Amino acid sequence: MGVLKFKHIFFRSFVKSSGVSQIVFTFLLIPCCLTLNFRAPPVIPNVPFLWAWNAPSEFCLGKFDEPLDMSLFSFIGSPRINATGQGVTIFYVDRLGYYPYIDSITGVTVNGGIPQKISLQDHLDKAKKDITFYMPVDNLGMAVIDWEEWRPTWARNWKPKDVYKNRSIELVQQQNVQLSLTEATEKAKQEFEKAGKDFLVETIKLGKLLRPNHLWGYYLFPDCYNHHYKKPGYNGSCFNVEIKRNDDLSWLWNESTALYPSIYLNTQQSPVAATLYVRNRVREAIRVSKIPDAKSPLPVFAYTRIVFTDQVLKFLSQDELVYTFGETVALGASGIVIWGTLSIMRSMKSCLLLDNYMETILNPYIINVTLAAKMCSQVLCQEQGVCIRKNWNSSDYLHLNPDNFAIQLEKGGKFTVRGKPTLEDLEQFSEKFYCSCYSTLSCKEKADVKDTDAVDVCIADGVCIDAFLKPPMETEEPQIFYNASPSTLSATMFIVSILFLIISSVASL
């Protein structure tokens, strides 16, 4: 491995040192191989960036009446209500226990409407049945709870979600008629946040207990609330008050085993605004991932769509994939989940359009950015970490150099990558990115990429880059014997002779 090779070269320069000296150098070497900026290790071995598909495409056929090519996705799951035993399981309000909410369209109260009025035990009993139904076996996968009707932080329930505040205040006033409105509001806030916290925590704890191999988390958590992209001077940053509120949700991050922020785009966002929007949301999620334990951060999987939220039949262009996928990879997240509805798969024509989009734009870009990320990880981190932007707010991306690589779709529907990296390509990685170690490992960033002899990286379905950067050379013998001066050789032979006499004397005793 790279780290072992580094140590071997390091020590070869000190062949004539004493054992004590080597111990000292070993001790000094260890700290330089550590880093304080850890990333979550891969969920699947040798898959540093994971792609998941969470759309109802199971009945969609492409050209030649064949299923859509899902070979690049490690986890696949349909959000349809009757789909079970999937790689991605998403729980909506009607699929996990008795989630209390007020219908935003009809105003109908469901399960008491607010968390203070639900029986937590009844909810957990029902949730247990739902979990075993949707997850009959505990295979590795994602468990995403999508409850968006109310937010556990009181202050974040602004219009139209202020109905949950009003209903909570009314409940307190009914039970405590002597309280003023100010007093009732404060008490309602405390009761709502406690009940909401208990509801979310106990639900996810039950999920982890029953299906521990799944990655449990809540969709849209954490959120940045940086939606003000139409205002002048928009820079995408999260408001300080929202960062503080995310800090106050440490109880939720402590129980989660994954984070699922959202980076959906709409057509109202300019290219610059879209980039800044996504960049800051992913960055905040990565910051939050370290709140439970900075040395063992949670994996971050960004939920995205391949269409716009306000034009659900318009696919993202390659540039817009850069704003979403490219940003997420370059910032060091663990993966992306592509979510979708039946809208882009409702007919044979729409399925063919999706199939063509995947062949010509989506899958080639996934191959591009994934191979570039793996190549950078192999060169800079010896595959024991991920490459992260040195300047998080730059537009540096992990992409294959188009002058040196071509991604092609062969006749059989299989992608191939032609070309090989140059030393200049690797130097670009080193100039723009640094190595962030996985939390389970200690690693050393390669000091000089010029020492790279070869690159050998693959992703799903055998799509690989396998190339020598230097011509193979014959193994050289240690310089101490062949390239030493006569005086050095004499001294060496003298030392060897003394050692031989000592060993012989000990052996004869």
UniProtKB/Swiss-Prot annotation:
Entry keyword set: Cell adhesion, Cell membrane, Disulfide bond, Glycoprotein, Glycosidase, GPI-anchor, Hydrolase, Lipoprotein, Membrane, Signal
Post-translational events: N-glycosylated.
GO biological process: binding of sperm to zona pellucida; carbohydrate metabolic process; cell adhesion; fusion of sperm to egg plasma membrane involved in single fertilization; hyaluronan catabolic process
InterPro entries tied to this protein: Aldolase_TIM, Glycoside_hydrolase_SF, Hyaluronidase, Hyaluronidase_PH20/Hyal5
Catalytic activity: Random hydrolysis of (1->4)-linkages between N-acetyl-beta-D-glucosamine and D-glucuronate residues in hyaluronate
Tissue spec: Testis.
GO molecular-function term, one example from the UniProt record: hyalurononglucosaminidase activity
Proregion residues excised on maturation: 491-509
Covalently lipidated residues, kind GPI-anchor amidated serine: S490
Residues annotated as glycosylated: N82, N166, N235, N254, N368, N393
Entry's family note: Belongs to the glycosyl hydrolase 56 family.
One annotated Gene Ontology cellular component of this protein: acrosomal vesicle
Topology of the protein relative to the lipid bilayer: Lipid-anchor; GPI-anchor
Result of changing R211G: Reduces activity by over 90%
Cystines in this chain: C60-C351, C224-C238, C376-C387, C381-C435, C437-C464
Name of the protein in its database record: Hyaluronidase PH-20
Subcellular location: Cell membrane
Annotated EC: 3.2.1.35
Signal peptide stretch: 1-35
Gene name as annotated: SPAM1
Outcome of swapping E148Q: Loss of activity
Enzyme class, first EC level, given as a word: hydrolase
A Pfam family assignment: Glyco_hydro_56
Function: Involved in sperm-egg adhesion. Upon fertilization sperm must first penetrate a layer of cumulus cells that surrounds the egg before reaching the zona pellucida. The cumulus cells are embedded in a matrix containing hyaluronic acid which is formed prior to ovulation. This protein aids in penetrating the layer of cumulus cells by digesting hyaluronic acid.
Organism: Homo sapiens (Human)
